[in-house]
Swiss-Prot record:
This is Cerebellin-3. Glycans are attached at N82. Keywords: Disulfide bond, Endoplasmic reticulum, Glycoprotein, Golgi apparatus, Secreted, Signal, Synapse. PROSITE patterns: C1Q. Heterohexamer; disulfide-linked heterotrimers. Interacts with CBLN1. May also form oligomers with CBLN2 and CBLN4. Residues 59-197 form the C1q domain. May be involved in synaptic functions in the CNS. Changing R119A: Promotes self-association and secretion independent of CBLN1. The lineage of its organism: Eukaryota, Metazoa, Chordata, Craniata, Vertebrata.
Length: 197
């Protein structure tokens, strides 16, 4: 004897809002419908395309994610050859949903206000050397990670953080000390929007 699976039936209340066009009359009662809930709309949120909303069948706005890797060694800190001391650049962008990551500067620029998750994984090249990497929010270091075991040739400095960002905030990595190994795409930087604020 098998157990049958039944989809739950929900009563949906359609609240008619008074629109400028005057579609609803004052004092009208909510309409109750029996059926299956297919779409839940939050009050005050647009349901058509445009800023703040997407039409049914479209991708929702605010989809933001990036992942980038290095494919070659980084110069020692302060000797990047491009005039930007210690900035870490990623020459291969694997994902750039929302176009927030700028390959030229190595920075992620927040397109929308929200809470974001960031992660980096940086591998040192040589033993007897310390690698120090800082995740920067605009010009301020937020977190740092170290790899400094003298007996390990390939050790990783890895960290992650959740940050509330405003539009235009810049998040990047800065190499404070050491060299990076990226020949096998071991050094990476990624982030995504968890939810808008």
């Amino acid at each position: 004897m098998g157990t049958e699976w039944h989809k739950p039936k929900l009563s949906l209340a359609l609240v008619l809002l008074t629109l400028e066009a005057g579609w609803a009359q004052e004092g009208s009662e909510p309409v109750l419908l029996e059926g299956e809930c297919l779409v839940v709309c939050e009050p005050g949120r647009p349901t058509a395309g445009g800023p703040g909303g997407a039409a049914l069948g479209e991708a929702p706005p605010g989809r933001v994610a990036f992942a980038a890797v290095r494919s070659h060694h980084h110069e020692p800190a302060g000797e990047t050859g491009n005039g930007t001391s210690g900035a870490i650049y990623f020459d291969q962008v694997l994902v750039n949903e929302g176009e927030g990551f700028d390959r030229t500067s190595g920075c992620f620029v927040a397109p929308v206000r929200g809470v974001y998750s960031f992660r980096f994984h940086v591998v040192k090249v040589y033993n007897r050397q310390t690698v120090q990497v800082s995740l920067m929010l605009n010009t301020w270091p937020v977190i740092s990670a170290f790899a400094n075991d003298p007996d390990v040739t390939r050790e990783a400095a890895t960290s992650s953080v959740l940050l509330p960002l405003d539009p235009g905030d810049r998040v990047s990595l800065r190499l404070r000390r050491g060299n990076l190994l990226g020949g096998w795409k071991y050094s990476s930087f990624s982030g995504f929007l968890i939810f808008p604020l």
